[in-house]
Amino acid sequence: MIAHWEQGRATVDALISARRIERIPPNRDLADEYLRQARAHLATSLLAAGTDPVGEFQLAYDAARKALASILINQGLRPTSSGGHIAVYEAVLAQLDPPLGDVFKPFGWMRPLRDDSEYPSPDRPVASGEDAGAGRAAAAPMIERAAKLLDLMPVYGR
């Protein structure tokens, strides 16, 4: 494991200062549970393929979100209610892009589509079957990369 992680420190510190992310005791068991849930969500989304595009997409989105959150939980960080899902994305991306932006950046397009699907309106379409497939394809590498990162990234410290 790396002793001290510098990349993205200014962004994560700013998220903490703004109370969008908070420090918690690091919890590897909970991080592993989040990854287990992420894999289950992804598998369930695939089982539903072709039957419920919005539900399929939301499961793929939740799989991706829990993969990203597992990284933070393992570091002793979590989003606050005011930070929400976007704070998770910002904290992970700040620390891991580069080199892993290609793996984690798809969460950026998934989040607003999830919101549009959860709170639909006539001018914002909900997720389609194609979106669900793309969401599954994006979530799978996020889960696998997060699983590998848990052994590499240290507890977040000052």
Could you describe each region identified by the protein language model?
Residues 1-158:
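Terminal alpha-helical segments
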